[in-house]
Amino acid sequence: YDYYVSSRIKSDESDYHTASVTVKNNFLGTITMEGSADVNPQEANESDWFVIDTKDYDDETKVDEETFQFNKQVNCMWIRFKYTIKAANQQGEVVEILYRN
């Protein structure tokens, strides 16, 4: 599957991490909020990152348009977002990801 990974975002180590994510046009895939406790995590090194929360859209759960939130209290120094596209001919898209901590 094709996937996109955001750049890393410096976070407040022990605070709530909130993200608002908007998808549209029947997006099929997985959106994941990831964190890292490393001082200098590498974008390409998956072992530097752990999953905080995931939202999955498949044929049964896809929607024309939706905004949802991740809201988790996690101890980490960095945050990033990843989305994986599950269909080769997909028309759906992730419109925006807004992050606050």
Which residues does each predicted region cover?
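Beta-sandwich interaction modules
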Residues: 1-14, 49-101
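Intrinsic disorder/low-complexity segments
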Residues: 7, 20, 38, 45, ...
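Short beta-strand/loop motifs in extracellular/secreted proteins, especially
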Residues: 17-19, 27-32, 89, 93-95
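Aromatic/hydrophobic beta-strand junction motif of beta-rich domains
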Residues: 19-24, 81-83
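Generic detector of ordered secondary-structure context
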Residues: 24-25, 73
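Non-cytosolic beta-sandwich-type ligand-binding/adhesion modules
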Residues: 25-67
